[in-house]
Amino acid sequence: MLNEFKTFIARGNVMDLAVGVIIGAAFSKIVDSVVNDLIMPIVGAIFGGFDFSNYFLPLSSNVNATSLAAAREQGAVFAYGNFLTVLINFLILAWIIFLMVKGVNKLRDSVDRKKIEEKPDAAPPPEDVKLLTEIRDLLKTR
């Protein structure tokens, strides 16, 4: 059973998946930083200097706080600001992945085109095949 497990782990697909998950986790942190530290402050400046993550709607009448943390202590709130931040984060990540896939597909297409261009022309058919083709064509015309 141990040998079977070693074979399973040593397969390329499992290793590729492990590397992908690790890189994805690190990449997610980069995107979070880009959104929270670079994009959201600009969006906040454009829309009057506010922070989306602090936006909420009170769901109970005793919530009258102005910050999300204080409002959560007072009662139930609908914290849609954090959702907006996460949504923007997702859209940026999806856009970056789209651009990466598009680039890889373009590279793959150019490699495939080069392979097609590099293929030598097909060898001319042998004389007997040419003769049989001519006979077939003559029989079709009759």
From Swiss-Prot:
Gene3D superfamilies cross-referenced by the UniProt entry: Large-conductance mechanosensitive channel, MscL, domain 1 (1.10.1200.120)
Function in brief: Channel that opens in response to stretch forces in the membrane lipid bilayer. May participate in the regulation of osmotic pressure changes within the cell.
Signal sequence range: none
Matching SUPFAM superfamilies: Gated mechanosensitive channel (SSF81330)
Membrane topology term: Multi-pass membrane protein
Name of the molecule in the record: Large-conductance mechanosensitive channel
Annotated TM spans: 14-34, 38-58, 81-101
UniProt subcellular location: Cell inner membrane
Similarity section: Belongs to the MscL family.
Species of the source: Agrobacterium fabrum (strain C58 / ATCC 33970) (Agrobacterium tumefaciens (strain C58))
Chief subcellular location: membrane
InterPro entries assigned to the protein according to its UniProt record, in alphabetical order: Mechanosensitive_channel_CS, MS_channel, MSC/AndL, MscL_channel
Pfam families attached to this UniProt entry: MscL (PF01741)
Gene behind this protein: mscL
Subunit note: Homopentamer.
